[in-house]
Amino acid sequence: MLLHLLVLAPFAAAILMMATSKEDPKSSSRLAFLFGFAFVAMSIALIAAGNQATEAIEWFQIPGAKGSVYYYLYSHGLGAWMVFLSTGLSLVALITGCNTFEKNYRNFAIAIFALMGAMNGTFLAADAVLFFFFFEAMVFPAAVLIAGFGGADRKKAAMTFAIYTLVGSAPMMVALWYLVSMADNSLVLSLAVALQNLDPSMQTTLLLCFLLAFLVKTPVFPFHGWQAITYAEAPAPLSAILTGAMSKAGVFGFIAWILPIFPLSMKVVDGMLWLGLLTAIYGALMALRATDGKKLLAFSSMSHLGLAVAGVFSLSESMLPAVLVLLVAHGLSAGAQFYLMGIAERFAGTRNIEQLGGLAARNPVFGSLFGFVAVLSLAVPGTAGFVGEFTVLMSLWDMGPLPALVAGLCLILSAAYMLRFVQKVIFGKPAREYVDGKRMTALEGSSISIMGVMLLVFGMHPAFITNALQLFDESAVQEMNKVTHPAAVQESQTVEASADTTGEAEVDENIAAVAQPMTEDDLRQLDSNLKANGFSDEERASLIAQLKAMSESEVADAHEEAAESNEANVKEASENE
């Protein structure tokens, strides 16, 4: 029920927001805050609950495919924390947007809730087609928010964003359709098994189609052409969501869909690792020369996400917890900085850092909070960013000293551009005179401060994040195992029912034919899937052993039952003679 609520309730909230009056933004904001806090509470409960799954509901069948597409949600540590970022950043966006879009706040809140629902669906979908549906559904509300609430070039930014993301995902849609048509269903294990029956060249082609969609969404160099203008022209609350939550869908895709399904050659692994490091270096260098505050933060985000991609393809044992901590830390710090940059633009009337300056003197509370969040984003010891980046560096060291050294250079560059950013915005003298605009409200300051405190708490005790990877619910795994082989389960149930009623020899033969043990390839793919979804070595070994024993026991029982039935039939036939 909790998983269904987190995916479907935001869309319901968007519909309910339509009933509020456009002329009464206060009532709209109160209702939006109520929904926002409720969704954050649900996401926290989801993290505490551990791995869980809904019942797999048959949705529809793709023409030419053997199996059906399921509405099936599954939560693991990585997905649960991404949902927390989605709901948390959306709540802060609703809070900051209340003071920025007073006259049209209702429409702003409607689009935010629709975007939240699509993001949550992306991070919780266990069916590949369902995942792709939500993956693409994120584009529409985000584009509407950019076009309706963005800056001077908002229409160009919205068009660029939509074209890049939709065109980048088109090859994945074709590849997914082809792969689903070869598989029993569109769940991870079935897709992985179907892929094994294809020749290496086709496997590589399908892999590239999937990779392209995730490379564009993250984005990774050279597929980043949409990012700078989109983040700059989008309203600051949306920019915070784009960088803090929506961009994580790309990295999430690498972990949850690429690694479990596709066999990766070392050439692909090395290529992706160095592409991530190139992105990290490129983003840091572009941030060093940026004068637009939001573009600087966009390139900074690109650099950190490039480091996360490199960490994913280090494929070390510590990869998943390292990348998870880095993603959570980046989501909180980058999101907070975009919110603050939006408040600075509202106050000073510009986001050009050369024309800002002296905000610490003109607005001391804002200046103090801005400096506090900037220091936290530098990944100093004691912060979540430090834990995430240090553990990713250790993961890269497993691939050799050179990748780790390149990543270390990125961290030095990040310190350089962030210190320059702070110096230009809150210290010195402004390059022009301006009348003070709207100041940061107490609610805005409190919500952003909480994000900063969370970075400190998670830095002191990162187990708050990584423990979610160890929480284990057997019922969720049983449900997952049940739907990975739906055809075999249905056939087995049908045959057993027939055996009870007919007792015919050919039915007994069917029992023995259907009740086949899981092959080593099946078990290997299942182990890879469980590992990618955060299960520990002990949990995976225990589950695989149980499934193997259950499978062998069921086969033995089926054959024994068939033999006994055949013997009875022979005896009955001889008596009749």
Locations of regions flagged by a protein language model:
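Short phosphate-coordinating micro-motif centered on Lys-Gly-acidic
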Residues: 136
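Hydrophobic alpha-helical transmembrane segments of polytopic
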Residues: 3-13, 28-42, 79-86, 108-115, ...
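Cytoplasmic juxtamembrane regions at transmembrane-helix boundaries
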Residues: 98-111, 244, 435-444
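Low-complexity, proline/glycine-enriched hydrophobic segments characteristic of transmembrane helices
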Residues: 464-577
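Cytoplasmic/organellar membrane-interface segments at the starts of transmembrane helices
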Residues: 234, 363-365, 418-496, 500-501
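Transmembrane helix-loop-helix hairpins at membrane boundaries of multipass inner-membrane proteins
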Residues: 1-2, 14-110, 185, 190-193, ...
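Hydrophobic transmembrane alpha-helices and their helix-loop junctions in integral membrane proteins
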Residues: 92-100, 106, 116-129, 141-390, ...
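C-terminal TM-helix exit segments that contain a strictly Trp-centered aromatic cap at the helix terminus
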Residues: 41-51, 173-180, 380, 462
